[in-house]
């Protein structure tokens, strides 16, 4: 694999990946953040250049120092020929199979190569999937170097119409001081490693909340290092009031204004969330969201 670290090549890859959306969207979103400051210190690998068949985005080596930190040890993969991915994936120089890790992508056909590579390295694999939701704009996306990541801290004040609809609620940036609150209410979190991950996300990426009458967040949403919107939550006391919907609408408006790509995923059984997501203008993509959680035999969870 070739390490791409030239800004011109990274931009060329970004433009090329746009032609493979939605299948390439997980890698495309990660590359967006790499091209705009690289706050998570990620690196890009391709099998060849300028013609390529496979792209892997992973944290730089100095980031992956905790063998148990699957929030950090994440590999995002896109392949033009997923059936031939096994040889690349089983290479321990590409994937550190001695760690607890995640492999993410929007191609179910990657699974066969991942499972075979994991088996050859004595690693257990657990696969999860969800529906992928995107906007019409991102399906029409054409890459441009005019895209600029704005400062989330400079997002400005809530729209007048939003304030008039919710006089006791205020739209605000979700800053690092609320990391504990987010972690305590994230089903995939609630531990010290997830707290560290959330702090990094809130410190570097777009995140917003609705402050309630008491001045604390009652609804919030964040973004991850691949531009996926997630960790959305509304405090039970303030649910079914439309605050979450208004919050997402405001976030979508901001992200569109700043040319920041975004998308979301919803478990197929969450029909209520699917209906709300569709009502916001999201479309179900032709491919699905996939994640492979990988555990070395000595680190397999009980």
UniProtKB/Swiss-Prot annotation:
It catalyses: an acyl-CoA + L-glutamine = an N(2)-acyl-L-glutamine + CoA + H(+). One of its GO terms (biological process) is glutamine metabolic process. Pfam families: Gly_acyl_tr_C, Gly_acyl_tr_N. Keywords: Acyltransferase, Transferase. InterPro entries: Acyl_CoA_acyltransferase, Glycine_N-acyltransferase, Glycine_N-acyltransferase_C, Glycine_N-acyltransferase_N. Coiled coil: none annotated. GO terms for cellular component: mitochondrion. Putative acyltransferase which transfers an acyl group to the N-terminus of glutamine. Can use phenylacetyl-CoA as an acyl donor. This is Putative glycine N-acyltransferase-like protein 1B.
């Amino acid at each position: 694999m070739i390490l791409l670290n030239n800004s011109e090549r990274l931009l060329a890859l970004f433009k090329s990946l746009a032609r493979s959306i939605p299948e390439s969207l997980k890698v495309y979103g990660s590359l967006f953040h790499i091209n705009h400051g690289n706050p998570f210190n990620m690196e890009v690998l391709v099998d060849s250049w300028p013609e390529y068949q496979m792209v892997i985005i992973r944290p730089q080596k100095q980031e992956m120092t905790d063998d148990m930190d699957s929030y950090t040890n994440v590999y995002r993969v896109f392949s033009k020929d997923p059936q031939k991915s096994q040889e690349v994936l089983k290479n321990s120089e590409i994937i550190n199979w001695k760690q607890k890790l995640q492999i993410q992508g929007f191609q179910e056909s990657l699974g066969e190569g991942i499972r075979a590579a994991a088996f050859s390295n004595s690693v257990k694999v657990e696969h999860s999937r969800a529906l992928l939701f995107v906007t019409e704009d991102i399906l029409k996306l054409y890459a441009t170097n005019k895209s600029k990541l704005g400062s989330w801290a400079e997002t400005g004040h809530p729209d007048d119409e939003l304030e008039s609809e919710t006089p006791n609620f205020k739209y605000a940036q979700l800053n690092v001081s609320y990391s504990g609150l987010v972690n305590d209410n994230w089903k995939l979190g609630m531990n010290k490693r997830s707290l560290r991950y959330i702090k990094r996300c809130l410190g570097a990426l777009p995140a917003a909340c609705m402050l309630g009458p008491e001045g604390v967040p009652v609804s919030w949403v964040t973004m991850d290092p691949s531009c996926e919107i997630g960790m959305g939550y509304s405090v039970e006391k303030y649910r079914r009031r439309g605050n979450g919907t208004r919050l997402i609408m405001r976030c979508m408006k901001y992200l569109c204004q700043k040319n920041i790509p975004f998308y979301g995923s919803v478990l197929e059984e969450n029909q209520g969330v699917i209906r709300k997501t569709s009502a916001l203008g999201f479309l179900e993509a032709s491919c699905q969201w996939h994640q492979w959680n990988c555990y070395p035999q000595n680190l397999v969870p009980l």
